[in-house]
């Protein structure tokens, strides 16, 4: 389950792909166009888009860490939260869960001192431990692809830290004072494999540098009853009016300053009262804009799924190969925050999703579909791949064989010509084909292809030399 990147896909992407909404551009008080200060309005939407990742990460942090102890998907600051099993179809804690990797996540601050992450010998098992800054950029990725599977220890240092680390510890410098670890460990989901992964998870440790090599007991943590623990993160962010949003953004930028590359963009925002290191000045923001700025800005963000060149639309699949490191592409960074919070670098994982078949029609469990891979054309990865079935709200679908994902773990059967067919339908395709069956609901559904450690060269989804096949409706 991903408690990070798909916190708010619950609203559905199809309805969010429209152009700027009429309600936002006109509103209850008349049309927006033609009023004085329109230039400032669009500048404010730029600022909203720019800050969307930082505000969303903060709201996510508040929810995940608002717990007295590690339990389920929550745990205090500075403690690793390890999920111990895959969810079933009744799970409703977060959207778009997965059944390929078990997560180990943590939030901590590096403003006062570095934190040390210890990873045991993973015994050849695939894993990765991306480290994200407050702006959702992945600044380091220890893991199988980059550092191997042996025991390893890292110190995550803050932007202003300088000092000497103990021998054998590699430094990763975070650009911000807030750090988000999102560890993933491959697991087949069998009782034996669960036990093996649990033994590894129990050895993941993070401690302040001053306690490295010593016994460490995390400080007590209390629950803040004012934090909304039920409303999805994205919805909470989107509910803020512009003043509340910019006040929070200004406060966050004091501890997580923009990068040097952002300076020209950020300098523009002073005109509307947003200056790094200072409190937000709401007097510089037209009161008529306060409610409309978030509406229009979010529509601009979601429009990127259609118009941003980083977002690919191929054979009914939609995916982005410019994730994890965004530079100054603030719109792409914002849309990934909205629909894929915590996304990996493309070299580590790509997550194409599909709501429509090869003919452009919405998937419907009343029909039968086949995803056909020609011989030697299965997803080219060094890690693993899978296809997951979701209902329209991005939850698993109950089915008689309790299968929510299909991958080579099912010992897929090949056709006589060496090709492979995945059968996507509500009823069994027959016992001889059940190994290749991904059960669908009776109604609408969504598919997601996960590709971990995808090839970077031919054949590769990253450079376009490998193409995802369409999902075709069959008689």
Where are these regions (language model features)?
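Hydrophobic h-region of N-terminal signal peptides that target proteins for export
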Residues: 17-23
